[in-house]
């Protein structure tokens, strides 16, 4: 059953979603990017039209985004609509933000739950992969130990194909995190182009990596994600042809000891 606060917010947004009431709506956390927020009654997501469509947004993903942008008013609204307080806590930068969102007593998300997202949930849809991407790349509270676990899981997945490994290595050397590269890789592998477009928007410099992975799988749809010159695309095509030509038939050992060694910095 919806809480009294949720019912009040719904009534306010339905009665006062007019231009002259934007100050009230902003104060109540019902406006984002100059648009009024509605809770979809069909999919339980969030939208700007009060109508269900494929533009409805996942509440947890939206919550992560607004906390990163420091909009605690909207964050409170999303929490009242059922967004995950556990994930909200991972994105709070200090105790003041936790207190403002009443998250002091919320349990931390266990490491294995985040790892489970990395290894399974991203296959569901674009939004699930974006949640994984936000958790690993934009959360301030993911522990160093968890990042190492994630690093090990990623490396154990990719090292059996040295062509893929070499492509990762080129961009890892440019100071992109392994988890960022891996999320881009998954978006292309599972053809989650909406997620890919949003991730590349956050890290524009990673676009050539997306092209290289796309060409590795003969997927030229990736080039439509963002505009590039013909020369940029041709350069990526030639580079991946060279990488596949040199490494294409080489495979690594897959035992645990070798995977762990490969995950250390001297192999990257």
UniProtKB/Swiss-Prot annotation:
Induction remarks: Expressed in the early phase of the viral replicative cycle.
Keywords: Early protein, Host membrane, Membrane, Transmembrane, Transmembrane helix
TM segment ranges: 176-193
Major location category of this protein: host cell
Membrane topology: Single-pass membrane protein
Subcellular localization, as worded in the UniProt entry: Host membrane
Domain of life: Viruses
Extracellular side: 194-268
Record's GO cellular component terms: host cell membrane; membrane
Cytoplasmic face residues: 1-175
Free-text function comment from the UniProt entry: Plays a role in virus cell tropism, and may be required for efficient virus replication in macrophages.
Record family assignment: Belongs to the asfivirus MGF 300 family.
Entry protein name: Protein MGF 300-1L
Source species of the chain: African swine fever virus (isolate Pig/Kenya/KEN-50/1950) (ASFV)
